[in-house]
């Protein structure tokens, strides 16, 4: 764990939604609660109301796309982003946020980029967080194949971008909810708290 303060440790508790149509949303909720956030599972547009931040978890991107279409969530998700509230996308969540899907982040994701035969692997990556590298777990992961000038690349694996930030949006190709290291979620929650303070 880093020396980052747990959001919610001071002041009013922040509320973070986790898109819960499919994928590893429960594990994200556990980490967020451990760090002091109030968590709501998001399945329909009304669930976005009153949230300070949102997580799009890993899972199966085609299934997630169908769920977003079925529940008419695409425009509400874009509006949530337009309001300046932070969003965190992991693995399939990164794919959902790219140009070819929700169009929220100026990136193009390459699905299953490390090869379908490589089901999972773990490597240390440097994100500039206190405490040193993060043990990043990749499961049939994408990478960022292309990005616009406003996108900051935060980490690479074998020369391929696997973590990035654009404005209030953080995306990673790995599964930070699985490794037992809460620092990436803490980084996101700090941005949520900062955004809420700025909007106050």
Q: Where are the predicted features?
A:
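Conserved beta-strand segments of alpha/beta enzyme cores
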Residues: 38-40, 135, 152, 170
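Pocket-forming structural segment of enzyme catalytic cores
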Residues: 100-160
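Cysteine-nucleophile active-site neighborhood
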Residues: 60-126
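N-terminal beta1-alpha1 cap of cysteine-dependent amidohydrolase-like domains
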Residues: 1-70, 79, 182-200
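Cofactor-binding loop segments of dinucleotide-utilizing enzymes, especially the Rossmann-like FAD-
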Residues: 21, 92, 174
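C-terminal and late-domain segments of enzyme folds
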Residues: 1-10, 143-200
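Structural motif
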Residues: 55-57, 88, 138, 171-173
């Amino acid at each position: 764990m880093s020396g980052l303060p747990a959001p919610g440790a001071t002041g009013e508790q922040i509320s973070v939604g986790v898109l819960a149509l499919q994928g590893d949303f429960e594990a994200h909720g556990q980490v967020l609660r451990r760090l002091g956030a109030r968590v709501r599972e998001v399945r329909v547009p009304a669930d976005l109301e009153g949230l300070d931040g949102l997580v799009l978890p890993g899972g199966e991107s085609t299934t997630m796309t169908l769920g977003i279409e079925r529940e008419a969530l695409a425009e509400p998700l874009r509006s949530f982003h337009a309001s300046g509230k932070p969003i965190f996308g992991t693995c399939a969540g990164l794919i959902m946020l790219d140009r070819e899907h929700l169009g929220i982040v100026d990136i193009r994701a390459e699905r299953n980029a490390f090869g379908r035969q490589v089901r999972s692997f773990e490597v240390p990556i440097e994100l500039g967080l206190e405490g040193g590298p993060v043990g990043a777990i990749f499961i049939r992961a994408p990478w960022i194949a292309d990005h616009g000038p406003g996108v900051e690349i935060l980490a690479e694996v074998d020369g391929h971008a696997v973590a990035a930030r654009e404005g209030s949006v953080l995306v990673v190709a790995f599964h930070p909810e699985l490794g037992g290291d809460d620092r990436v979620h803490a980084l996101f929650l700090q941005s949520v708290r900062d955004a809420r303070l700025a909007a106050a």
